[in-house]
């Protein structure tokens, strides 16, 4: 752990994260213990939940397009590590299976892996040789040429040529906003929407999501062919109230850890007051309203599902036994992997180990009393 003392409060908290989300935000790089690559079991569980919808949609789309020779897809917010290529494999598997059943030749497939420029694309690219070898071994001549490329940039804006994509997918990315909402300097003691947040904070977060999500839809409408499909999965909330427990509880616990550190003189409370996460968990009706208002897509499916907060507590892990300490560590490392870049940029790297040790203890205690789940929204849309 980096050292710091009670008498030497780090001089960070410049608030520049407000304007530099695109430059700062990334999942923790590499393959070490605290990396996203090692702490993304929750995200893998979400991908597995969506797999039947993904495969059914890809099969129906490829058939509807009359088995085209070329098929182009994009995965938005791909991040880094082993999860990155799971969706690509599932799409290939669906197409290969359909071609086998119908006697058609497999297409040439182009896959664009998109994330912000600060993403660890190098880790992703290092996975490609083994991935291509696995495809050849498992599918043989049943799989056509597959070209996988990185496409750095924000999906809140254009990324690809007009009408160049057949299918777009995104998992656990759209809840990240393009920037922290403006005008929420009065959100004292919170790092997100919370029970004590003033009303204008809720309004600002919703307005930023409306703006960002509308821009995402407009951008993809230009890039997806008519009749093409898009599937998005992201964190949401179960009720309209923006302070619902499935929306705010975990981040309120993280904020309490920061406030404890401020009370001990380890960080400045003013720095907490100027830090807010660029994140929004929408209510399902908010999503539906934005899609209908933007007007470029028809909603095929709009549904919700839940997964346990500890990604290791899933249907595939039959031997899972709850352990307060281990569960707290699992959840803490997951949240560290997704938020460390923003927290370290604002508060300094020296506090990160201590912060997430405290968070592991708090979240473990909470989960020993109450099983908490992540509430998710799945939307499948067709380009008009």
Located regions from the model:
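Short, conserved SAM-binding segment of the class I
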Residues: 163, 212-219, 223, 290
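Intrinsically disordered, low-complexity regulatory regions of nuclear DNA-binding proteins
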Residues: 212, 382-384
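Mobile active-site "lid"/loop adjacent to the S-adenosyl-L-methionine
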Residues: 170-215, 224, 238-275
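Substrate-binding/catalytic lobe of Class I Rossmann-like enzymes that use SAM or dcSAM, i.e.
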Residues: 226-351
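Soluble or luminal CAZymes and related metallo-dependent hydrolases
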Residues: 46, 208-212, 279-283
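Conserved, well-structured core segments
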Residues: 111, 166-172, 288
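N-terminal charged/capping segments associated with class I S-adenosyl-L-methionine
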Residues: 1-163, 175-197, 232, 237-238, ...
């Amino acid at each position: 752990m980096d050292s710091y003392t009670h008498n030497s409060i780090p001089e960070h908290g410049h608030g520049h994260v407000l304007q530099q989300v695109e430059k700062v935000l990334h999942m923790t790089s590499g393959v070490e213990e605290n990396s996203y690559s090692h702490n993304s079991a929750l995200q893998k569980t979400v991908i597995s939940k969506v797999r039947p919808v993904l495969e059914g949609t890809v099969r129906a789309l490829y058939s509807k397009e009359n088995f085209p020779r070329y098929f182009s897809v994009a995965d938005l917010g791909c991040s880094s590590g082993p999860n990155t290529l799971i969706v690509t494999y599932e799409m290939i598997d669906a197409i290969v299976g359909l071609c086998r059943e119908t006697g058609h030749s497999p297409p040439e497939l182009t896959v664009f892996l998109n994330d912000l420029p600060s993403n660890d694309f190098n880790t992703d690219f290092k996975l490609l040789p083994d991935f291509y070898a696995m495809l050849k071994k498992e599918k043989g001549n049943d799989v056509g040429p597959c070209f996988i490329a990185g496409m750095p940039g924000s999906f809140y804006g254009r990324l690809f040529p007009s009408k160049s994509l057949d299918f777009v997918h995104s998992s656990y990315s759209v809840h990240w906003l393009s920037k922290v909402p403006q005008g929420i300097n009065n959100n004292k003691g919170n790092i997100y929407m919370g029970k004590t947040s003033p009303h204008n904070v809720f309004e600002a977060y919703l307005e930023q999501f409306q703006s960002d999500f509308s821009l995402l839809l407009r951008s993809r409408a230009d890039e997806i062919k008519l009749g093409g499909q898009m599937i998005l999965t992201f964190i949401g909330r179960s009720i309209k109230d923006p302070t619902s427990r499935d929306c705010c509880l975990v981040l309120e616990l993280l904020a309490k850890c920061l406030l404890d550190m401020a009370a001990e003189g380890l960080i400045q409370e003013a720095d907490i007051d100027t830090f807010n996460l660029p994140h929004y968990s929408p209510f399902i009706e908010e999503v539906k309203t934005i899609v209908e208002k933007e007007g470029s897509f028809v909603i095929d499916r709009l549904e919700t599902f839940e997964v346990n907060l500890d990604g290791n507590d899933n249907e595939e892990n039959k031997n899972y036994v709850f352990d307060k300490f281990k569960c707290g560590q699992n959840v803490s490392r997951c949240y560290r992997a997704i938020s460390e870049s923003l927290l370290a940029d604002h508060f300094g790297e020296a506090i990160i180990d201590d912060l997430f040790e405290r968070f592991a203890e708090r979240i473990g205690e909470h989960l020993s009393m109450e099983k908490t789940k992540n509430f998710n929204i799945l939307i499948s849309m067709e380009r008009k």
